[in-house]
Amino acid sequence: KYAIFGLHKNYTPQYIFDEIKSVSNIKFHLFEDLILQTHQGKMAAFNSQLEFINKQPFGLELDCDAIINFPSSAQSPSGFALNMVRNFLQLTSEEKNCKYLHICEAAPSSASPVQVGKALSFFITDFIKEPYK
């Protein structure tokens, strides 16, 4: 199974959507469909993606291009807020079948190396720390 959360419709070619829709074990949520949802609505949608894949071992890929104004290979003025992404990571870390985190597309520049490094360290610690009790 494969789940895609926050896929940007405007940057995804139609042939990719055609392929995704032809495979029954792929589920996706478009970013554009999530924009007007509340924080709780976004978390519920993310949780439904987790429920789709969490019955067997899985990994989480965090594409930094999906984070608003994050220095990345395809930086965008539209995306998830950093703290929302941290919430997604914390929720995922509670899944016993989540075996790895892959962070990709971060592209620190000379203007932002410290901020990118801090964000990446937040992502890692959010993913590996024990839940608050």
Residue ranges and their predicted role:
Residues A3-F5, Y15, E19, V23-K133:
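Catalytic cores of soluble, metal-dependent hydrolases
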Residues H8:
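Residues in the short beta-alpha loop(s) of Rossmann-like NAD(P)-binding domains
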Residues Y11-P13:
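Conserved ATP-utilizing enzyme core subdomain
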